[in-house]
């Protein structure tokens, strides 16, 4: 029996990145030997065991053979005669097909070290094309390691295109697509994930609402980058700099979906694209089974981001109504989230990357003023039932009006 550290732990250590999870491959053993040694079996479809002390995963070396459609249609073979090289060959990328023995020596049968040095994401073998989930995984790796200068090998991108055009991605479940997307949204450069999907044709299949934005022009005066798809990825990049939250990043990604519905004869203007985009947000989220809290913020951002841009022009009643509409009294974090997504929208434009966004500050200040109006004082003044809410709203409007007169510049 020989045990090797494999995959991401070896890769990230070589890149000088923190190692989170360690996975091990066991060569020359059987399930019974593992059980006799005190390991606990957890894999049903293939033999994976937990170490009795560390609880890290130890898998018997195995090969996989395509036996059906999609990413679950595989038959596994695990036996003492399966070599380490056999096991590593089933991995997706060469940089993930690295192993380390107990002496610290790196075993590299597929030139993963060379690709690591050259910052290349390259598939190990043609078997890559048998698993459609790998298209999303490679896009996610491209986003995760973009800051280190990694790019996808030409032949790997070509294979991803072939898989997409062959309809392989249609076998992916919504849950798996969302899981990979959510993970990509946590990376430093989530926009790279969607750009890679577009490059291989997968964006049109999995995110048609986003793909439809490419080629749709916006007024050059406000959008020097002109193309709405490019602007969308720029805003996502900016959102990633402003917030680590997946819901903020996803909402920013979806903020302009309504522009994809504008008839070409009305281009480059997109009047009413915010409210129009709400239905597309709901459609996308329902299809991918996006969690409700993330969906709800994306709907609000689509509907209200343009309103926040015009903040100095809003009257106090409209501002308080906005807080009502986003349910800020029960979910105060939404004020900050809307301020961040609107800022990402403004700064996600060519030449505006370092622009100030005072509307975000004014929104936050107005919220502090509105929520500082005490409910207790209204109740103690003798108001009852619906009168309490009406009087509370009136006082909030008055407080915001007073603040706006002193602190918020008059619209030009």
UniProtKB/Swiss-Prot annotation:
Swiss-Prot/TrEMBL GO biological process terms: RNA repair; tRNA 3'-terminal CCA addition; tRNA surveillance
Catalytic activity: a tRNA precursor + 2 CTP + ATP = a tRNA with a 3' CCA end + 3 diphosphate; a tRNA with a 3' CCA end + 2 CTP + ATP = a tRNA with a 3' CCACCA end + 3 diphosphate
pH dependence: Optimum pH is 9.4 for AMP incorporation, 10.0 for CMP incorporation, and 7.0 for the phosphatase and phosphodiesterase activities.
Impact upon substituting residue 255 to A: Loss of phosphodiesterase and phosphatase activities
Domain HD positions: 228-329
UniProt-annotated binding residues for CTP: 8, 11, 91, 137, 140
Binding site residues for Mg(2+): 21, 23
Cofactor(s) it depends on: Mg(2+); Ni(2+)
Domain remarks in the Swiss-Prot or TrEMBL record: Comprises two domains: an N-terminal domain containing the nucleotidyltransferase activity and a C-terminal HD domain associated with both phosphodiesterase and phosphatase activities.
Complex and partners: Monomer. Can also form homodimers and oligomers, but with low levels.
Family: Belongs to the tRNA nucleotidyltransferase/poly(A) polymerase family. Bacterial CCA-adding enzyme type 1 subfamily.
Functional note: Catalyzes the addition and repair of the essential 3'-terminal CCA sequence in tRNAs without using a nucleic acid template. Adds these three nucleotides in the order of C, C, and A to the tRNA nucleotide-73, using CTP and ATP as substrates and producing inorganic pyrophosphate. tRNA 3'-terminal CCA addition is required both for tRNA processing and repair. Also involved in tRNA surveillance by mediating tandem CCA addition to generate a CCACCA at the 3' terminus of unstable tRNAs. While stable tRNAs receive only 3'-terminal CCA, unstable tRNAs are marked with CCACCA and rapidly degraded.
Protein name, UniProt field: Multifunctional CCA protein
Organism: Escherichia coli (strain K12)
Gene: cca
